[in-house]
Amino acid sequence: MSSNTHFTPLILAGIAALCGLSVANVYFNQALLPVFAGAMSIDAGQTSWIATASQMGYALGILLIVPLGDRVAPLRLCRVLLAWTAAMLLLASQATQLSFLAGVSFLICMGTCIPQVLLPYLAGLATAGERSRVIAWIQTGLVIGILLSRAIAGWLADHLGWHSVYWVAACVMALCALVLPRILPQRHAPGIPVAYGRLLSSMLHLFWHEPLLRLSCALGAAVFAAFSAFWSVIAFKLMGPPHNMNATEVGLFSLWGALATLLTPAAGKLCERFGTVAISLASIALCCLSFVLSMAWANLFIVLLACANLLSFALQLGQVANQTRIFSLSPESRSRLNTVYMVCNFCGGAFGSALGGYLWLRFGWTGCATLGLLCAVLAMVALLAILRPRSKQLSVV
């Protein structure tokens, strides 16, 4: 397959849009948590379980489904996942209780692992020199989907009720299932002759024997925990004094973070120029800075806007660096490498969402921001600890 033929900007833009629309299902409920609290007469700590269930469902979907990308044609697998997600979204629109909505959110997000099926597939088609650029395109779509989903969900909830968000999302997934064959060229999967059980168990072997995979997992989980802690409680922060926003305004706040995604293609070029270690260091430093600023000036709206932007770009930098690193390890195992990385990533996200909600109830914004800062500091310590004895090894990836 020629990369000049199949990785035109138009093709990559279409795939990035598909990935963004898919991953939006994991995150749009974060803008609705205060709405759920009012509609179901529950507190902020309880609503955080909806976000946590979503991320855990996504992680389990990645763990159980994405490894099939080493065996099954991506087009067929993605169409099945899109149909499943659409059906579960319609079911969620009928929810009246927290437990039911959290359970169905878990099932929705199990099927929303489509971007993680496509990422290793497309990375395998890319040349080594353009791999970072391809990953950066897809990461741009993912983060735009994450951030715009909150804005759109907030607007729909204010004007049509929260049930309408799920109806619209179901229709979008059904449309994506129809459009997908026109965007994604159908190619045969590698067809590794390994039983499904052995395919799953082989991921433990990869994790144990690939130090760069373990490093990427640790960095990704820590930064994503910080990112999730911020976004799981920011709606409560903005809806309370002194900001007193409504759901639409909270959703629009997320649009500021979307500006950072305009820089994501540059992240791919920076990664190719300076290496993954330097980009990982920059990612963690920006994450630390965003939480320090938000703790110092939590009641200044402009500071929170700036922090959202910094944090989004930090996440983008880290993801591009980490996935460039792991996709260089073993060409025949890219889906499983990505599975291990993303499961760790979203377990970190679930941890950040759950603990962020708890700390918000106990200590307010200071507790949540402290959690984010600690996660970033731990990531920095881990990277520096491994970098010292292995600087020559790490500098080449």
Residue ranges of model-derived segments:
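Juxtamembrane intracellular "pre-TM" segments in multi-pass secondary transporters
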Residues: 2-5, 185-217
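Helix-to-loop junctions at the C-terminal end of transmembrane segments
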Residues: 62-73, 262-276, 360
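Intracellular juxtamembrane helix-capping segments at the cytosolic ends
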Residues: 114-126, 317-330
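Helix-loop-helix hairpin linking two adjacent transmembrane segments in secondary transporters
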Residues: 137-182
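Cytoplasmic helix-loop-helix junction between adjacent transmembrane helices
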Residues: 105-142
